[in-house]
From Swiss-Prot:
One of its GO terms (molecular function) is rRNA binding. Signal peptide: none annotated. Binds 23S rRNA and is also seen to make contacts with the A and possibly P site tRNAs. Belongs to the universal ribosomal protein uL16 family. GO terms for cellular component: cytosolic large ribosomal subunit. This is Large ribosomal subunit protein uL16. It comes from Lysinibacillus sphaericus (strain C3-41). The keyword Ribosomal protein applies.
Length: 144
């Protein structure tokens, strides 16, 4: 499970998830990526579940990069407790994902295997996803 080693504050505000992702919109390490189309919190358990689904389908071949990390603690009050009397205790960790963010990347496998592995991973996540291919950059120059 992914979780921070230590944090400055145990509890955080919920925040908002308006707008698109600021960075991490391109496939930078692998050949194929899984891109979020909607905004959501993704828990450390969901990230781990998606990772296991991908690696099992690839039969330990290729390489997987996880590009999101659950830095944000979320809290929950116990069941049947009245409102008030402070914020609840930390329940788990989430990664805030906005539209356009590349969450996972894959390299070292064929296109069919990569597409199917990312499709299986997308079913484990609470966001709509799109499978994207790496864009080659810096090929030609305009000088003559």
């Amino acid at each position: 499970m992914l979780l921070p080693k230590r944090v400055k504050y145990r509890r955080e505000h919920r925040g908002n998830m308006r707008g698109e992702a600021k960075g991490g919109k391109e496939v930078s390490f692998g050949e194929w990526g899984l891109q979020a189309q909607t905004a959501s919190w993704i828990t450390n358990r969901q990230i781990e579940s998606a990772r296991i689904a991908m690696t099992r389908y690839m039969k330990r071949g290729g390489k997987v990069w996880i590009k999101i990390f659950p830095h944000k603690p979320y809290t929950k009050k116990p069941l049947e407790v009245r409102m008030g009397s402070g914020k609840g205790s930390p329940e788990g960790w989430v990664a805030v994902v906005k539209p356009g963010k590349i969450m996972f990347e894959i390299a070292g496998v064929s296109e069919e295997v990569a597409r199917e592995a990312l499709r299986l991973a997308s079913h484990k996540l609470p966001v709509k996803c799109k499978i994207v291919k790496r864009q080659e950059t810096g090929g030609e120059s305009n000088e003559s």
